[in-house]
Structures are given as structure tokens and as C-alpha cells.
Amino acid sequence: MESIRQKRINSLLQHNMAEVFQALAAAEFPGTLITVSKIRVTPDLGLARVYLSFFPIDRTEKAMEFIQEHAPRIKNELAGRVRHQLRVIPNLQYFADDSMEYEANIERLLREGGENPIK
């Protein structure tokens, strides 16, 4: 269970990371929407797992490669934004959040019709 401090830091990081990725998408990936779907900080506040979703979905792999290569630059940009709220910036791990793709697949299956497996 997350502490109140973890929840506050998750929220702070998510808001600021969204701004960082908005600028990054405009500069490096025009026409691509990068969304910070969630951030989970460990109890010791040393590691933050950042879950990103991309639209269009076919640009996910290329964008994730770019983000992994430029992780120090992204962390530095984040540190500049939250330097007055956090003493130490957690290490950041990036993961592609495929929940949008999963939802799109479910929508497609429902639209196609077919037999309902739940009766």
C-alpha cells in the first residue's frame, strides 16, 4: 500500500513528466502523443517506474528507444522542474503502457460481433 508521501510524489512527478514529454514529442516526434499513464515510486523513493502510452501505437518502439537513449537528459529536465519540491530525484525506469492497445483490441472484437463468451 502506498503512503501519502508516495502518492504525492507520484502526482508531482506525473504532472512534471507530462510537461517534459509534451515538449519532447513536439521537438522529436511531431504528430505523436506521449502520455504518462502512471508513475509508481518505491517506498524508499529511490526508483520511479514511468509508464508511457503512445499514439499512434506504431511509433511506440522507436519512441521508447529514443527515451532510453536520452534518459539522462530527460531526468535532468525533470530535476530542473522539481528541484524545489524534491531533494533527490529518483532513478527513472521507462515502460511502454499497452493498455490503450488492449482496449482497442477489445473494442474491435466487440464491434466485429461474433459469439459472446459470457452468457
What are the residue ranges of the model-derived segments?
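Charge-rich, low-complexity N-terminal segments
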Residues: 1-47, 51-119
